[in-house]
Amino acid sequence: MNDSEFHQLADQLILYIEGQLDNYDGNADIDCETNGGVMTLSFDNDSKIIINRQEPFHQIWLATKGGGYHFDYKEGQWICDRSGDNFLTMLAYAITEQSGEQFSFP
């Protein structure tokens, strides 16, 4: 993958997350801000989730209360380089844990 392909895939992921959060109709207050390629999700309990792109490694990094994770693009999805879990699955779990309300991506 070249840098241009990486940025296109990373942009698609960020736009998808933003769209899902915009359509979220649950009770938890989840604020979403994207600035300079870094997405910050903020919750009522003052916890945050940070999603950012690491261009030199062609990775997406996820920082949650539970820890930090690095994701590589493999076979059409972002996969954790340690656990092998899907990015959206891990993000949904982190949002559920930090918001106190069940969250999932379609």
From Swiss-Prot:
Q: Name one GO biological process term.
A: iron-sulfur cluster assembly
Q: Does the keyword Metal-binding apply?
A: yes
Quote the InterPro entries the UniProt record gives: CyaY (IPR047584), Frataxin/CyaY (IPR002908), Frataxin/CyaY_sf (IPR036524), Frataxin_CS (IPR020895)
Question: Domain of life here?
Answer: Bacteria
Q: What does this protein do?
A: Involved in iron-sulfur (Fe-S) cluster assembly. May act as a regulator of Fe-S biogenesis.
Family per record: Belongs to the frataxin family.
Q: Which NCBIfam families match?
A: FeS_CyaY
What name appears for this protein in its UniProt entry? Answer: Iron-sulfur cluster assembly protein CyaY
**Which organism is this entry from?**
Photorhabdus laumondii subsp. laumondii (strain DSM 15139 / CIP 105565 / TT01) (Photorhabdus luminescens subsp. laumondii)
Gene this protein is translated from: cyaY
